[in-house]
């Protein structure tokens, strides 16, 4: 039996540590340094703008309701209920795996070239493409540009608006990486799952989901129906990358070390300590208003993630148990062969 005095001392040190952490987050961010960094570094400004959009846009209850009304919930939950369950906390992992399957196989489609709405032609019958500005109607749905093709069969113009409005994507149900990640992030949020939008500077995006069962952030890519395979980009696709940044409701974090296992591109557009400072400042701003207990919980989770991302850290038993096999399919699954080759994502 543990001597009560040791329990008392342990509780005292834990309380002091908790108070220390809480006070850290209550310290004001040096705004002069933030403003100077945003003025002098273009990349810092880009991250700041993305944080303003991506950290809050999916917190929309009306959108969540629209997603749940559109998806086949009976089918999704029936499939989840058939999956093996070691612990109640594993249920959300199974739900995410089923959402990945459902989204890729039953709901959303990949668009190499759009289908002609006039005659239904597709593939080699569709030629182009020029880039045009959106029409007034297309612009209503946060459309930045439109790919315009020509149908050889019926001589019609075929338009592929690159919509950024996830509710419009719920209607069109087609797109490429950006559209897939955009809507799937909203799908995860609609099911009450903690999720991040992961942005890669070399033109790819995916998600992460916080697993209560594994107690860590899990890589999730709806294009590939991939769960907990962070190695696929640098290993399987042979993709070269520089920065991977995660955005979510309560933070901005550099997760590059989780994904860039080889083919590291130079990281020279912002000083490393400036990037760390900016992420910390943006995270502090997002956590304004949290209770002391919530702030402490987030800090502890952040701390564990940094141990995971730090390659020099000694792995815990839990980390060793959760090691994943860095094998699998060579190259990317989604997209045409020509498109994947042009992006350096075909595994060669």
UniProtKB/Swiss-Prot annotation:
Residues 338-348 have a biased composition (Basic and acidic residues). It catalyses: Hydrolysis of an N(4)-(acetyl-beta-D-glucosaminyl)asparagine residue in which the glucosamine residue may be further glycosylated, to yield a (substituted) N-acetyl-beta-D-glucosaminylamine and a peptide containing an aspartate residue. Substrate binds at residue 224. Keywords: Cytoplasm, Hydrolase, Metal-binding, Zinc. Pfam families: Transglut_core. GO terms for biological process: protein quality control for misfolded or incompletely synthesized proteins; ubiquitin-dependent glycoprotein ERAD pathway. It is found in: Cytoplasm. GO terms for cellular component: cytosol; nucleus; PNGase complex. Residues 311-348 are annotated as: Disordered. Signal peptide: none annotated. Its cofactor is Zn(2+). The active site is at 177 (nucleophile), 204, 221. Its EC number is 3.5.1.52. The keyword Ribosomal protein does not apply. Zn(2+) binds at residues 116, 119, 151, 154. One of its GO terms (molecular function) is peptide-N4-(N-acetyl-beta-glucosaminyl)asparagine amidase activity. PANTHER family: PEPTIDE N-GLYCANASE PNGASE -RELATED (PTHR12143), PEPTIDE-N(4)-(N-ACETYL-BETA-GLUCOSAMINYL)ASPARAGINE AMIDASE (PTHR12143:SF19). Belongs to the transglutaminase-like superfamily. PNGase family. This is Peptide-N(4)-(N-acetyl-beta-glucosaminyl)asparagine amidase.
């Amino acid at each position: 039996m543990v001597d009560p005095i040791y329990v008392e001392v342990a509780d005292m040190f834990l309380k002091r540590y908790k108070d220390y952490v809480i006070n850290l987050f209550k310290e004001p961010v040096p705004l002069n340094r933030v403003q100077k960094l945003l003025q002098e570094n273009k990349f810092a400004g880009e991250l700041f703008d993305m944080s303003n959009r991506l950290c809050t846009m999916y917190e929309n209850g009306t959108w969540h309701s629209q997603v749940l009304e559109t998806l086949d919930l009976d089918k999704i939950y029936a499939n989840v209920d058939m999956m093996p369950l070691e612990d109640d906390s594993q249920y959300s992992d199974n739900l995410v795996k089923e959402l990945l399957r459902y989204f890729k196989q039953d709901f959303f489609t990949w668009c190499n070239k759009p289908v002609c709405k006039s005659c239904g032609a597709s593939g080699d019958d569709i030629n182009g493409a020029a880039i045009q500005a959106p029409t007034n109607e297309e612009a209503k749905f946060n459309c930045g540009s439109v790919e315009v093709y020509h149908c050889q069969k019926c001589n019609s113009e075929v338009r592929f608006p690159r919509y950024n409005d996830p509710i419009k994507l719920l209607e069109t149900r087609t797109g490429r990486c950006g559209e897939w990640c955009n809507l799937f992030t909203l799908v995860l949020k609609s099911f009450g799952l903690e999720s991040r939008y992961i942005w890669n500077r070399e033109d790819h995006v995916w998600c992460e989901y916080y697993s209560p069962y594994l107690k860590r952030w899990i890589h999730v890519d709806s294009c590939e129906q991939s769960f907990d395979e962070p190695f696929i980009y640098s290993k399987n696709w042979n993709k070269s990358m520089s920065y991977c940044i995660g955005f979510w409701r309560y933070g901005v974090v550099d997760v590059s070390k989780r994904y860039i296992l080889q083919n590291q591109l130079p990281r020279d557009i912002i000083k490393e300590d400036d990037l760390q400072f900016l992420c910390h400042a943006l995270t502090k701003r997002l956590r304004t208003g949290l209770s002391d207990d919530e702030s402490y919980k987030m800090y502890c989770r952040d701390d564990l993630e940094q141990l995971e991302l730090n390659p020099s850290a000694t792995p815990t038993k839990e980390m060793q148990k959760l090691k994943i096999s860095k094998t699998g399919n060579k190259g990317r699954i989604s997209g045409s062969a020509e498109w994947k080759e042009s992006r350096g994502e075909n595994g060669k």
